[in-house]
Amino acid sequence: IYKDPISLFKQTNFSKTIWWKLKVNISGYQNQTEDKLVTEIFKNRIFRLLYPNIYQYNHKFQRILIQLYEDGYVCWINLDGLIIEKYELRKTENFKNERFFIKDQLNSILKWIKDQADLTNEYLWGGTLGPNYDCSGLIQTAFLKHRIFIPRDSYQIKSFCKHLFYFKDSYKALRPGDLLFFGNKEKCDHIGIYKGDGLYFHSSGRDFGRNGIGLDTLKHSNDKISLHYKSKLISAGRVVRSYRWDRTIR
């Protein structure tokens, strides 16, 4: 039986400590009014309400501000079409073999990305549901599909990963599944995943990239797109843990 989200929030006094499960795929937006997509959110993901609170709910509003459980991401979502249910968090246990679990999933993650690349796709800012992705949406979803939670945006993933090295000329220490970070001294603004043999997958835009998921090289090349991204390489990182709400600094 469908229950209006606002009536559910009222029952819990708009608590920020109650968790909710999404029953539909939805879009996440940058602010309360504009249609600036920042992410797409899978059905069955978990969130908590940040806005409105019990003193504000009488105001007319079409969006609510939420924080997602699996990555701590904050965005606005539309109330229209929203279907949710209350969710009881289970006590999480320390996963002693987490690093080995992640390592075992990397070949499957790379195969999943290759399969996505074979589909008709184009670059979509905020895309995570597929077949259209942005750079970090592709990487986050690839890991999410394999029960590994990492942050949403490329600069957040960079901080979350185990730092391997800053780029000079060598890529020989990279392993398949390592992540590559691109940008400038101020900020990382692009991400790819290393396939092996100097090659990496990434979803790149229209202006300097392939307008979708492509394979580029770190080796010497005359390809303009590979050269552009090689010039922007910052560092490499390795996913060695899964984001956990109860232990990850937010």
Where are these regions (language model features)?
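...with weaker cross-activation on analogous glycine-rich loops/strands in unrelated enzymes
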Residues: 151-221
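Surface-exposed beta-loop interaction hotspot
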Residues: 84-123
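SH3/SH3-like beta-barrel superfamily modules
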Residues: 2, 38-82
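A generic structural signal for residues embedded in beta-strands
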Residues: 22, 49, 181-182
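Catalytic cysteine-centered active-site loop
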Residues: 119-175
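Short, well-ordered loop/turn sites that connect or cap secondary structure elements
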Residues: 14, 41, 173-174
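Aromatic- and glycine-rich peptidoglycan recognition patches
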Residues: 1-10, 15-30, 35-38, 166, ...
